[in-house]
Each structure stands twice: as structure tokens, then as C-alpha cells.
Amino acid sequence: MRHLDFVLSPLDQFEVRDLFSLNANLLGNLHLSLTNIGLYLTISIFLILTYSLLATNNNKIIPNNWSISQESIYATVHGIVVNQINPNKGQMFFPLMYVLFIFILVNNLIGLVPYSFASTSHFILTFSISFTVVLGATILGFQRHGLKFFSLFVPSGCPLALLPLLVLIEFISYLSRNVSLGLRLAANILSGHMLLSILSGFTYNIMTSGIIFFILGLIPLAFIIAFSGLELAIAFIQAQVFVVLACSYIKDGLDLH
């Protein structure tokens, strides 16, 4: 009797699957479904709301650990907004930046839980967020400056002969913000999880091959543990980088530089 061995791809963990689906005859052929990415996004929102309620600490004067952690996040995001935009105009964008930071951070952390789903590894999610941010910054620029907003694509002090080429380069660079902002987040999360999956499978195969290989497998196992700590740091760093770049794009819309 032959045994078939199936080799699972490291990309299988990122596959979007239907968990529940319903076909209804309302409004034509209506298909309703709950996917794993939808489920984990719902879980992340629930965790954020729970965290916010715990951090209020029933409005007590003495803060608890949840309150201290939330105040640290507040201070971090507020410092980014003030430094990247400015102390006055930046205040109105602080709630948006805080929501972006905590949403990306929580979804990054959920993805680190074994057998969970990394929502921020999907480009459809990160591109949707980045496109919304860049589009909002562009609308803000036109609202404040009108057609003068196009001066953002004209480098100061450039020769007249090179002006058409430089304007084209600046315009393409501006459009690429939609892609680069979302691509940076998804690519970092995707590559980290793929590497952990490959190393985990490699270590498992070594450690189940005998006592000697089990001892040798402790070396890559230690590396996996260390790399998991690095992934935890990357979860925070990528949320911070996303907010920093979002603030810089908003600043361009406000100040045209």
C-alpha cells in the first residue's frame, strides 16, 4: 500500500477560506459569506474595544496596567503626529492616526499567534488602507490649496529644460505612494510568517528523525524563538512606520512640502 505525502506550501496559511456561506434569493442571486480574514478582523475590533474598556479603569484616578499601556501608545502616536505634521494642525488628525496604529498593531499581533490568520499580510487590506490615506491627503490638499496643489510636483530651483521630466517623475512618485505604503506592511508580515513556517517545518523534520537529530534540532529551534521575538518587534515597528508615512503624506497635503 502506497502512502502519499503531501507537502504543504508556506503560502497555505494566507489562503482566504469561506467559514460560512449563505445563498439568498433576495435582490437576485445574493451570496453572503464569512471568511477567515473577516472573522479575524472582527476579532481584532472586539479586542480593541475590550482593551479600550479595560484601559478606562472605571475612570479611577490610579491607573491600572492597561491604562499605562494605552497612555504609552497615546504618547507615542501623539509624538509622531506632532513631529511629522505640526503641534497645531496635527491635533485634528491624532484620532485617525491612533486608530490606524492600534488597528494595524493588533492585527499584526494576532498574526503571531500559532494557527491564527495574519490579516495584514493580505495586500487587499493594506492597499485599501493606504489608498484611503493617500486619497484623503490628496483631497485635503486640493481643499486647502486648490490648483496650487500641483506645485507639489514642481521641485524648487529646477532648470526649465528639465521641468517636464522632473514633474513626471514627481507625479509617478506621488502615485506610487498608494502601492509602497501598503506593500511595505504586507510584504514584511508575509515574509516573516513564511520564514517562520519554513524554519518550523525544517526543525520538526530534524527533531523527529532520531535522538541525535533531536539534539541538533535545538539549534534551529533557538533561532526560531529568537526570530519570533524579532517578529514581535516588527509588529510594533511596522505599525509605527505606517503612521509616520501617513502623517508625512498628510503634511504634504497641508503644507505642499
Curated annotation (Swiss-Prot):
Disulfide bridge map: none
Alphabetically ordered keywords of this record: ATP synthesis, CF(0), Hydrogen ion transport, Ion transport, Membrane, Mitochondrion, Mitochondrion inner membrane, Transmembrane, Transmembrane helix, Transport
SUPFAM superfamilies with a match to the protein in the record: F1F0 ATP synthase subunit A
Propeptide boundaries: 1-8
Gene3D superfamilies found in the cross-reference section: ATP synthase, F0 complex, subunit A (1.20.120.220)
Chief site of localization: mitochondrion
Highest taxon of source: Eukaryota
UniProt-listed PROSITE patterns: ATPASE_A
Keyword check for Membrane: yes
Cellular compartments annotated: Mitochondrion inner membrane
Membrane-spanning residues: 34-54, 93-113, 122-142, 149-169, 187-207, 210-230, 231-251
GO MF assignments: proton-transporting ATP synthase activity, rotational mechanism
GO cellular component, one term: mitochondrial inner membrane
Pfam families to which the protein is assigned, alphabetical: ATP-synt_A
Mode of membrane association: Multi-pass membrane protein
Assembly with partners or alone: F-type ATPases have 2 components, CF(1) - the catalytic core - and CF(0) - the membrane proton channel. CF(1) has five subunits: alpha(3), beta(3), gamma(1), delta(1), epsilon(1). CF(0) has three main subunits: a, b and c.
Chain's role: Mitochondrial membrane ATP synthase (F(1)F(0) ATP synthase or Complex V) produces ATP from ADP in the presence of a proton gradient across the membrane which is generated by electron transport complexes of the respiratory chain. F-type ATPases consist of two structural domains, F(1) - containing the extramembraneous catalytic core and F(0) - containing the membrane proton channel, linked together by a central stalk and a peripheral stalk. During catalysis, ATP synthesis in the catalytic domain of F(1) is coupled via a rotary mechanism of the central stalk subunits to proton translocation.
Similarity field: Belongs to the ATPase A chain family.
Protein name: ATP synthase subunit a
Protein species of origin: Penicillium chrysogenum
